[in-house]
Amino acid sequence: MKLIAHRGNIVGPNPLEENKLEYIEAAIAGGYDVEIDVRCEDHQFYLGHDEPQYYVPMTWLVKRKDKLWIHCKDFKSLNIFSNSPIDFNFFWHENDKYTLTSKGYIWTYPGQSYCSNSVIVMPEVFDLQNTQNNDKISYNKKSFAICSDYVGKMI
């Protein structure tokens, strides 16, 4: 089972560090895949959940493509990735219960049914206090992956 660090978070949300290149690199170095928020502005890529915050070179994305789950935050980035000859793993969604990634995984909104090809997203939303207060939390191992702010606590 893959564990995906949401915006680079491992032991809880850290808004000041999320989507920063160094933060993402640390999560990858820790053995995790990472979900990142990508936007395109003036033919350049930026990371940032609500707005373009951190410039990211295409070469950086290519080098780490096997560890990244790219959440396209606008049409421009979605269009560029969908036409790229490089085999990136990317997706776009807003409030969908399910979204299919470019590699065929089912990005699954919290609380929805899932299967062995699903990525369960943010399971902690149903028990946040327990997640925050425990050093280790168990998770369901019957999905392909879990994307969470707390992957470092999962056993």
Predicted features and spans:
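Phosphate-group recognition and catalysis centered on beta-loop-alpha active-site segments
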Residues: 1-155
